[in-house]
Amino acid sequence: MARAKFERTKPHVNIGTIGHVDHGKTTLTAAITMALAAQGKAKARKYADIDAAPEEKARGITINTAHVEYETDDRHYAHVDCPGHADYVKNMITGAAQMDGGILVVSAADGPMPQTREHILLAKQVGVPNLVVFLNKEDMVDDEELLELVELEVRELLSEYEFPGDDIPIVKGSALKAVEALTDTPTIKKGDNDWVDKILALMDEVDAYIPTPERDIDKPFLMAIEDVFSISGRGTVATGRIERGKIKAGETVEIVGIKEKTKSTTVTGVEMFQKTLEEGLAGDNVGLLLRGVQKEEIERGMVIAKPGSIKPHTQFEGEVYVLTKEEGGRHTPFFKNYRPQFYVRTTDVTGTIVDYTADDGSAVEMVMPGDRIKMTVELINPIAIEQGMRFAIREGGRTIGAGVVSKIIQ
């Protein structure tokens, strides 16, 4: 029997379930796979399978994440669900599982809770651009007015964090009732059961409301330099993995970071495994031959990019998860003016943490291992940085924190 080929006929979108503990994220994930499996568009996954999420390592941090996949008429989805709250925080900050959109699950019986708020804030900070809401456990609320109040509360909370609270689709239903119906009759079709129809209605909203992301290959070219060689008679070659976009010989690029001034040059050749390549694409490991550039002028940690697409910066705000002692992090707290290294793309840059802020905007004096915190950083050298970019915080070569750039200051 030949292995099934992965058909790339539909656009691919990465999503995930977020929300407070016990509001039904994993049950909803199971319900979606079961409802779509009834139409032959997914493999049905039980709650227990999803809940027993395997451990993964991302930037040296262990995270439990379950991955499921399914299709609708329009798209192919990869969906992440995390068993524990700490896993969500780590997942969203490290970008271990990239999310193009999220399904925020809120229990209609309880309304928004502290982690509901925290996940909305995190989605905003780490750049999950669009959310759709599933108001779960509708079967446990008899009072229609109460449902409307909870919906209003969710919309206000979304608006508070600068999501378009008035426009976001909210679908009411019961993930558990849908799972029970599909467990009894796995072949339920659309129109056979109200609870299952509500799950399908949710997926219709996700299809319509969460835009298809721009593919890496269509974004402006960027490659972080890993190594630099000089080839006699040919010039200087910079090697690295193309992060996004594409590159051909003859195109103009900028070399950005570390030095005060950005340098413009022309790519005279693209090579892979010592062979000339017509075009380098996102994901390729290539060598770029650069016109009129001396080996001394460029180094690891700079990036080569489409002119004007990225600028060097020294000051930014980051949302950071600080590793616990058990995760290999620090054993002791740190304070203002702490000076670790910030590992960005391919290099470590020393920076000073000038202040710490809690979720409510109040100043924090001391940061403990295991905390999630917003920090303002000043680097000693300018580096090509953009919003949504991931970084690690290191001390003597070991990772003590993971972060994402939430705002550029200068």
Swiss-Prot record:
Binding-site residues, GTP: 19-26, 81-85, 136-139
Annotated tr-type G domain residues: 10-214
Region annotated G3, chain positions: 81-84
Key words of the record: Cytoplasm, Elongation factor, GTP-binding, Hydrolase, Magnesium, Metal-binding, Nucleotide-binding, Protein biosynthesis
EC number: 3.6.5.3
GO cellular component: cytosol
Residues that bind Mg(2+): T26
Location of the region described as G2 in the Swiss-Prot/TrEMBL record: 60-64
Entries under PROSITE patterns matching the protein: G_TR_1, G_TR_2
Stretches for region G1: 19-26
Region entry G4, spans: 136-139
Quaternary structure, from the entry: Monomer.
HAMAP family recorded: EF_Tu_B (MF_00118_B)
Family note: Belongs to the TRAFAC class translation factor GTPase superfamily. Classic translation factor GTPase family. EF-Tu/EF-1A subfamily.
UniProt-listed NCBIfam families: EF-Tu, PRK00049.1, PRK12735.1, PRK12736.1, small_GTP
Physiological role: GTP hydrolase that promotes the GTP-dependent binding of aminoacyl-tRNA to the A-site of ribosomes during protein biosynthesis.
Protein name stated in the entry: Elongation factor Tu
Organism of derivation: Gloeothece citriformis (strain PCC 7424)
Lineage of origin: Bacteria, Bacillati, Cyanobacteriota, Cyanophyceae, Oscillatoriophycideae
Gene label: tuf
